């Protein structure tokens, strides 16, 4: 898969993250079939065209850490009701997007191929 196609798939998945939920760079990379490319997911989101209107603020690292240089991310998440632990990380057990119901209908991935969820 070339970079352009990878970016398109990142954008497609990111668009589907529901209000009040977060998802991780690593899980997006796994869904695309390149689990080792979580950093490339972050790169794709940093280059996302404004017209895509992606909810990039809903993508966090696997521990729930936010982008250090993006102060508005926490504000946007708080407006959606996202809660944080004392260490400043998103409460992942409460807000991580459970995509099992969305896989086939929205993203087009078979639930059997996503056993890691």
Regions found by a protein language model. Give the residues of each.
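Nucleic acid-binding interface residues in structured DNA/RNA-binding domains
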Residues: 1-117
């Amino acid at each position: 898969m070339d970079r352009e196609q990878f970016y398109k798939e990142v954008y497609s998945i990111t668009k589907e993250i529901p209000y009040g939920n977060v998802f991780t760079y690593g899980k997006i990379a796994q869904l695309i079939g390149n689990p080792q490319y979580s950093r490339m997911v972050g790169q794709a989101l940093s280059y996302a065209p404004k017209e895509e209107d992606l909810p990039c603020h809903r993508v966090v690292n696997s521990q729930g850490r936010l982008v250090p240089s993006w102060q508005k991310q926490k504000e946007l998440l708080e407006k959606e009701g996202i809660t944080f632990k004392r260490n400043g990380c998103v409460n992942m057990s409460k807000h991580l997007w459970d995509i099992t119901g969305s896989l086939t209908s929205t993203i087009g991935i078979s639930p059997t191929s996503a056993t890691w969820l």
